[in-house]
Amino acid sequence: MLLSDKDIRAEIDNGRVRIDPFDDSMVQPSSIDVRLDRYFRVFENHRYPHIDPSVEQVDLTRLVEPEGDEPFILHPGEFVLASTYEVVSLPDDLASRLEGKSSLGRLGLVTHSTAGFIDPGFSGHVTLELSNLATLPIKLWPGMKIGQLCLFRLTSPAEHPYGSERYGSRYQGQRGPTASRSFLNFHRTQV
């Protein structure tokens, strides 16, 4: 069940959902807007001949911070990691989906490639997978609205929520845009 603005506020007011910093003006009819932090992780395309999710490639990305109040310029066809300004913490019976903002999508900005789902129990900055599908560069201003979180109530609390020992939870408590850690639990079935 998708939570309404009334339910979102109630979950925040009683401390079950934490959005930090919280700004009530970000609450929408069935979502809460999130803003862009000031850190970006750019890909170093010359370091490796290819990306291999089965091995650690420590120099694959580099952390970048725009100077002062300057925007980050995302060029056509470019892909970077960024993160929400807000720290998001969910209880064991709520999951979330990160969706893009319609106005930014109409400019060619993709907010996430595939990883828009946030498990119950997660706590941390949400990593964004930003792509520019437009034919012109896009200015990304730290602090701008970048997406919206929709909250869903589970039919029952997760038996092993994100952050529990069972799943490893490689991104629990992440700060800023976090590079892939797929190598930590890479799985391949012989076919």
UniProtKB/Swiss-Prot annotation:
Which E.C. number(s) belong to this protein?
3.5.4.30
Q: Which SUPFAM superfamilies match?
A: dUTPase-like
Q: In which pathway does it act?
A: Pyrimidine metabolism; dUMP biosynthesis; dUMP from dCTP: step 1/1
Q: Which UniProt keywords apply?
A: Hydrolase, Nucleotide metabolism, Nucleotide-binding
The residues that the entry says bind dCTP are K101, S102, S103, L104, G105, R106, D119, T127, L128, E129, Q148, Y162, Q174
Example GO molecular function: dCTP deaminase (dUMP-forming) activity
What positions does UniProt annotate as the active site of this protein? E129
The record's Gene Ontology biological-process terms are: dUMP biosynthetic process; dUTP biosynthetic process; nucleobase-containing small molecule interconversion
Q: Does the keyword Lyase apply?
A: no
Instruction: Return the InterPro entries for the record.
Output: dCTP_deaminase, dUTPase-like_sf, dUTPase_trimeric
Pfam families named in the record: DCD
> Which top-rank group of organisms is this from?
Bacteria
Q: Which reaction does it catalyse?
A: dCTP + 2 H2O = dUMP + NH4(+) + diphosphate
- Signal sequence residues: none
CDD domains noted in UniProt: trimeric_dUTPase
Could you say which residues are annotated as the site Important for bifunctional activity?
A: G116, F117
What does the function comment of this entry state?
A: Bifunctional enzyme that catalyzes both the deamination of dCTP to dUTP and the hydrolysis of dUTP to dUMP without releasing the toxic dUTP intermediate.
How does it associate, per the subunit comment?
Answer: Homotrimer.
Q: Which family does it belong to?
A: Belongs to the dCTP deaminase family.
Q: Which PANTHER family match?
A: DCTP DEAMINASE (PTHR42680:SF3)
NCBIfam families under this entry?
A: dCTP_deam
Put simply, this protein is called dCTP deaminase, dUMP-forming
Task: Give the gene symbol.
Answer: dcd
